[in-house]
Structures are given as structure tokens and as C-alpha cells.
């Protein structure tokens, strides 16, 4: 490529970055930072721990967004200077350096651009993620546990705080179900593309004959309920049951009935929570999960009404959306976006960004197609 080609690429990247800065509203982010820093410095902040955690989490996120934009702007300016030097000195080595920096910038700006696609009503919310073992017996339960670790590792890689509300262990190995939250703004908009049925193909470590086994697990991503949602549930619409928390193999891990199960009588929705130390804490966590499920149900009903369709409760789990194949070859493939990789071990260790970004772009394309239909 010529100097002029690189100059044109940098011009395009500059325009894209300016658009990102405009959509994300850098001035608003700075104002949010000042407001949150003031709240974080209040002497009585930690009198309300939930509020304190929310403020510190939001401040960390806003600082991260501002720093990412500043870093991209700085790198872009440096690349322009580097290109000018390469042109002035006619130095092929410097031009090679420009090529590498332009390629890296294009990738980083492309990743940042994905954030501008999160404009749904609840996209800015924290996320509540539920994982449930499907068909496949003990392999499905093991797969559910693998998915839980995958998402927690993804959050850890990004420095996102998480809280596991519930883990229901299967008798032999793995999990029947698990529920956790990702406590950072836009977690719902980001992770909601992970909702659906996940499929694992491998040689079963639980089969004495070493046969290949296909198993399934469902992932459901919900927006965390906020006070403005006004999701009030009358006491007479709920049935509360308490029991002892259980660990792997069905072993009791508590000597008191601290685990809580709530059944919402009108809808039949059941939620459980057993990871907190006290029954009161588990009840509060279970109520938050129930509120999130009812909010999602309300959202689906409103969407169905707009589309003139009938709500399908099972549809919240979505169709089969990703396959993880460990035998006879190694591949993870998203069936909607065609995004794939030959390194499933890395994916299970939380390297999900490429799949999530492709999913967000795919969803936006689907929305635009529906709007134009």
C-alpha cells in the first residue's frame, strides 16, 4: 500500500472514531464521572452497601469508557505523526510500522463501535444470567457448569464484578442450573445475544465405553430490574419454600434451612437462591431474580403485541445458537453469525468477545431488516 492509501485509511478511522465519540457522548460521560466521583466521596456512602457497590461499579465503568476513547484518540494521532515521518524520510521500515499500527487501530475502533449498537430499552442495564442443563444427562449438567465458568471468566477478563445467586448441583457431576449477575452498565445489551440453546459434542468422560455424546444447555439473559420498573409482586401471588442448601452430589452444605424457593402462582415461574449465608439474603436475591423474569415476560408480551404474534414462553430460551465440538474435530461455531474458531479451550476460558461482537452486529442487522420489511 502507498502513503496515500494509509492516509485515506486513517481519515476513515478518524471519522469512525468521531462518530463513536458522538454516539457515546463523551461530554455526558465526563459529566457522569464528576457526578459519580462526588457520590463516591460522600462520607455516608457505605451506610447503604447496595448503593455503594452500584456507585463504584458505575464509576469504574465510566472511567473505563473515557480511558478507552482517550487511548484510541491518542493512538490515532500518533499514527498520523508516524505516517508524516515515514513520508518525509521515505523510510520503508517506518511505513511497515504504520501498517501494523493502522491494522491494530482498525481492530480496536471496530470493537469500540459495537458499543454504539446497544440502544435497546434495557441495553444499559446490568445482566442476570441463568444457565440450565438440558438433554444429555450428566454430560448436560457438566456442560452447564462449563458454561458458568466460561461466562465468569469472560467477566473476570474484563474486570466486571459478578455475583452468583444460585447453583443447583446435579447428583453425579455438574449443575442442574445456575444464576448470576454481571454488575456493570450495558452488561444486558452485551450478553443478551448469548441467550439460546448451546450444544456440546465430545467423547463423554462419564461413559465407560468412551462414546461420543451430544448434550445441551440453555442460557437466558435478563435485564436487572430497577426501581423505575415498578415490578411489585403481591405477597398472595407468591409461595415461599425453604430448604437446606446442597452441594455437589446432593450433599447438604448447611445445617439450617437457608435456601429459598419462590413460586409465582399466576405464571408458574419458579426461582431459587441458596448461595447467600442467610435465609433473608437468599429471599432478597430470589425476589430480584423473580422480578427480572416478570420484567422479561412483560417485555415479550409487549413485543408480541406490537408484532401481532402470540407470546411463546419457551421461546425465551431461543433456538440452538452455538455448537462446541470437541470430537471428532475441535471447533466452536455460532449458527446465526457463522463466527467460528478452532480453539474451544480458549472459548471455555472466557475468550468470547469475537462471538459476542458478531452477535450484536447480527442482531442489529436483523432489527434493521425487520424495520424495513
UniProtKB/Swiss-Prot annotation:
Methylated by PrmC. Methylation increases the termination efficiency of RF2. Gene3D superfamilies: 3.30.160.20, 3.30.70.1660, Release factor. One of its GO terms (cellular component) is cytoplasm. The keyword Repeat does not apply. The keyword Transcription regulation does not apply. Pfam families: PCRF, RF-1. Signal peptide: none annotated. GO terms for molecular function: translation release factor activity, codon specific. Keywords: Cytoplasm, Methylation, Protein biosynthesis. InterPro entries: PCRF, Pep_chain_release_fac_I, Pep_chain_release_fac_I_sf, PrfB. SUPFAM superfamilies: Release factor. It is found in: Cytoplasm. The modification N5-methylglutamine is found at residue 251. HAMAP family: Rel_fac_2. Belongs to the prokaryotic/mitochondrial release factor family. Peptide chain release factor 2 directs the termination of translation in response to the peptide chain termination codons UGA and UAA. This is Peptide chain release factor 2. The lineage of its organism: Bacteria, Bacillati, Actinomycetota, Actinomycetes, Micromonosporales.
Amino acid at each position: 500500500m502507498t502513503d496515500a492509501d494509509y492516509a485515506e485509511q486513517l481519515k476513515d478511522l478518524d471519522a469512525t472514531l468521531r462518530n463513536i465519540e458522538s454516539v457515546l457522548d463523551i461530554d455526558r460521560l465526563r459529566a457522569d464521572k464528576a457526578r459519580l466521583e462526588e457520590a463516591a466521596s460522600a462520607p455516608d456512602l457505605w451506610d447503604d452497601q447496595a448503593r455503594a457497590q452500584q456507585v463504584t461499579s458505575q464509576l469504574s465503568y465510566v472511567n473505563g469508557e473515557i480511558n478507552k476513547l482517550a487511548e484510541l484518540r491518542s493512538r490515532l494521532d500518533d499514527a498520523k505523526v508516524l505516517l508524516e515521518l515515514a513520508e518525509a524520510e521515505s523510510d520503508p521500515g517506518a511505513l511497515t510500522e504504520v501498517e501494523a499500527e493502522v491494522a491494530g487501530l482498525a481492530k480496536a475502533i471496530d470493537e469500540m463501535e459495537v458499543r454504539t449498537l446497544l440502544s435497546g430499552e434495557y441495553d444499559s442495564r446490568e445482566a442476570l444470567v441463568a444457565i440450565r442443563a438440558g438433554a444429555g444427562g450428566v454430560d448436560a449438567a457438566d456442560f452447564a457448569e462449563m458454561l458458568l465458568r466460561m461466562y465468569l471468566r469472560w467477566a473476570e477478563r474484563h474486570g466486571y464484578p459478578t455475583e452468583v445467586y444460585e447453583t443447583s448441583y446435579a447428583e453425579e457431576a455438574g449443575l442442574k442450573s445456575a444464576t448470576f449477575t454481571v454488575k456493570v452498565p450495558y452488561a444486558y445489551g452485551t450478553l443478551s445475544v448469548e441467550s439460546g440453546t448451546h450444544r456440546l459434542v465430545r467423547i463423554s468422560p462419564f461413559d465407560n465405553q468412551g462414546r461420543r455424546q451430544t448434550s445441551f444447555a440453555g442460557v437466558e439473559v435478563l435485564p436487572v430490574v430497577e426501581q423505575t420498573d415498578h415490578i411489585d409482586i403481591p405477597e398472595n401471588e407468591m409461595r415461599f419454600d425453604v430448604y437446606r442448601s446442597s452441594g455437589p452430589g446432593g450433599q447438604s452444605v448447611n445445617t439450617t434451612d437457608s435456601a429459598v424457593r419462590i413460586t409465582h402462582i399466576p405464571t408458574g415461574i419458579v426461582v431459587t437462591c441458596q448461595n447467600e449465608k442467610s435465609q433473608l439474603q437468599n429471599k432478597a436475591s430470589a425476589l430480584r431474580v423473580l422480578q427480572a423474569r416478570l420484567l422479561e415476560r412483560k417485555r415479550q408480551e409487549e413485543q408480541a403485541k406490537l408484532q401481532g404474534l402470540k407470546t411463546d414462553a419457551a421461546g425465551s430460551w431461543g433456538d440452538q445458537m452455538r455448537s462446541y465440538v470437541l470430537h471428532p474435530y475441535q471447533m466452536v461455531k455460532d449458527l446465526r453469525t457463522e463466527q467460528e474458531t478452532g480453539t474451544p479451550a480458549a472459548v471455555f476460558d472466557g475468550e468470547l468477545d469475537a462471538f459476542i461482537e458478531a452477535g450484536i452486529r447480527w442482531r442489529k442487522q436483523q432489527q434493521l431488516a425487520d424495520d424495513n420489511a
